[in-house]
Amino acid sequence: MVSFGGIARKLFGSSNDRRVRSYQPNVTAINSIEEKTKALTDEQLAAKTVEFRALLAEGKTLDDILIPAFAVVREASRRVLGLRPFDVQLVGGMILHSNAIAEMKTGEGKTLVATLPVYLNALSGKGVHVVTVNDYLAQRDAATMGRVYGFLGMTTGVIVHGLSDEERHAAYACDITYATNNELGFDYLRDNMKYEKNQMVQRGHNFAIVDEVDSILVDEARTPLIISGPLDDRSELYNTIDAYIPLLVPSDYEIDEKQRSANFSEEGTEKLENLLRQAGLLKGNALYDIENVAIVHHVNNALKAHKLFQRDKDYIVRNDEVVIIDEFTGRMMPGRRYSEGQHQALEAKEKVQIQPENQTLASITFQNYFRMYDKLAGMTGTAQTEAEEFANIYNLDVIEVPTNLPIKRLDEDDEVYRTFDEKFKAIIEEILDAHKRGQPVLVGTTSIEKSELLAERLRKQGFDDFKVLNARYHEQEAYIVAQAGVPGAITIATNMAGRGTDIQLGGNLDMRIERELGEVEAGPERDARIQAIIEEIKELKQKALDAGGLYVIATERHESRRIDNQLRGRSGRQGDPGRSKFYLSLQDDLMRIFGSDRMDSMLTKLGLKEGEAIVHPWINKALERAQKKVEARNFDIRKNLLKYDDVLNDQRKVVFEQRLELMESTNISETVSDMRREVIEDMVEKHIPERAYAEQWDAAGLKTGALNILNLDLPVEDWVKEEGIGEDDIRERLTEAANAAFTEKAERFGDDIMHYVERSIVMQTLDHLWREHIVNLDHLRSVIGFRGYAQRDPLQEYKSEAFELFTALLNNLREAVTAQLMRVELVQQAPAEPEPPLMQAHHLDPTTGEDDFAPAIYQASEVIVSPENRNPDDPATWGKVGRNETCPCGSGKKYKHCHGAFEQV
């Protein structure tokens, strides 16, 4: 029976269809001026950029010039790249310009589509960021599409790992900047740890187009970017506790794979307590006593490392390091580390060198970073399954762009077997059968372990003509994937490895030319060889088409339908034929965790024999329902985490905005004076209770406070004894004494130095307290869930206590700044005797592994540090600097006239 909604959609079209049709008048208008645009010379076409900018300066909007701007980009693409955007690509460009996500199938030219809104929005002069998932794609797209932008008189920059601040600043200053999501986030955090505005590399967040938007804003949404500093070395403790886990038996612990949790049973707890007691590590009588919180954290991490984390699935060991594998792409994530000691527990398990734990200095999630942009858009081949999340969290609609040619791919029903062995046997038979026909095959697996197991079984069949693409061979990724469309090619790939690189039937022309003719100079010989490659690829493509196109075989379903759809989408690009099929077994993770027992009994009743498969649309629907449940649960988790992170994010905005104001100010004397006044008011309020008699005042406490905070030894006890003295009188005398002392000091320092000292101390103190605040919030968040047992809402409790902590931070800031400024003095520093250079090691961030130093409270050092090891933003890394040396901060002044002019005492 057809539903009313189905009838309505047939009559009026879906909301997606109506939205796409709404762009048709603009497409028609762009096509109507195509011939006129083609008639322009190269110089006239490039001059359009100046003309458009003049129109914007006169008050026109970007929407007003969209039609001629898109026409200009289309023509520039045709002349420079030999590629003319189709009408549906124009629609995709308009969707991106309208703050939405364009869902475009694989091979539909997302990279080219982006040039249209990128050029249009770059005309504003505020910069456009094009975000990719890795450095390779950022460099590739910037190099290719940068030719179009350059032809039209625009500049293109690219941000990749390892660039200097100067190079980053120049890249961000370009009209268009290509970068990875990680680099953008880290540059934002690093900028907000700088001490001079001219040292910041980013210039605002105007418009970002995120390629593979589902990967970055959904899969990576929960991943915080963290810049951190090292804590004390506790590697011995990790090794000691790691040795206990293999002594446990299954009854000593409980594992919940669905929730990814591991806990000790009563028997296991008793066994651990005995072991810890013997080692002298247990305080008190029981493991879960409050004084053993740190030990509990260690043993829980060790248990998870052994029982939840699987080598070659969750991580691999490479070059004596534990390297995380992205569960969605199967790619290695070198440098990225699990936080809160989990990575160290894995290092202990694998008997590799244990890296020190880290303390968070600055952090932000991708959810909050990308929500800072004034305008945000995205592209992907698979977004509809996450449309609700994009709408709720990012306020982004998902609009499906029609393909230029109809999709001819055949998506077959899943085949379900009883066991792994039966499934793998069927897969191998299917692979070899397709190979005999000359059909290219892409086999998708969910882990390195599975891909290598399949490869081994193929070799046992006497067949080794295939490529394995997983995290171990990341460097060859793009080329292997690009050649997966050659007739008879067999490519085994983990999940979505190679995403961003098209699989073209017959092979990738550009990559073959680069690989085979990279050293051949331009000329007749090169041209002839290029023509030969073109003819060869044309012939190979026809053979692949005759064999049925690319055949995608999936070895199991992923938790997310979107990942499965991405794998299917590698086949059938641009109207090519293709085929896809999923092979499953009841021993697969998804089937095992989400109720394969019922299905097993059902298959038994049906009389399913060994080696036989069941194929039915009902099976597909049942699996999709299981996947939807997992997706809904993961969305709820991300949504809930965002509510907590929003609390920190609001506070982060306040602190970072305050830092920016401080950096932009040359004189903050009024702010410092207000801080001092408020500190004095707090002191008086604390030691002189309201409506109390003079003899009830805490004169001794007030005197001590004045000495400790204001650095003033005042006769407070004598003042209290005066006849008729009041609270206001005490406050006024303290204020006058403090102001007089500070004014005298400012006159001795001179205005320039005093203003510099004030700003430096306020910023450094703010940074120090903010880092402590992040640690406090992390701790609060880790325990706040227990409030639920007392029938209290953990989120509301967290908001309330986080606000109290932030209020305390501001109070502590006022007090610490006042105390330091009342004590700071100019000193003459004599040159120190030379000492061995300090070897400054870069520390690894626990979640991202970025090399980062963090500014610290300035302290005098007696160690000589070689200039290349000094971080301009962190005085703590400078060591002893000669008075006549150039100041390491980068100001260009001599040290004695810059940072060396003052020292906190």
Swiss-Prot record:
UniProt entry keywords in alphabetical sequence = ATP-binding, Cell inner membrane, Cell membrane, Cytoplasm, Membrane, Metal-binding, Nucleotide-binding, Protein transport, Translocase, Translocation, Transport, Zinc
Enzyme Commission number(s) from the entry:
7.4.2.8
Membrane topology qualifier:
Peripheral membrane protein
A Gene Ontology term for the protein's cellular component: cell envelope Sec protein transport complex
An example of a GO molecular function for this protein is:
protein-exporting ATPase activity
Q: Which GO terms describe its biological process?
A: intracellular protein transmembrane transport; protein import; protein targeting; protein transport by the Sec complex
Q: Which cofactor does it need?
A: Zn(2+)
- According to the UniProt record, what class of enzyme is this? translocase
A family per Pfam: SecA_SW
Family, according to the entry, reads as follows:
Belongs to the SecA family.
- Recorded protein name is Protein translocase subunit SecA
- Which species does this protein come from? Rhizobium johnstonii (strain DSM 114642 / LMG 32736 / 3841) (Rhizobium leguminosarum bv. viciae)
Corresponding gene? secA
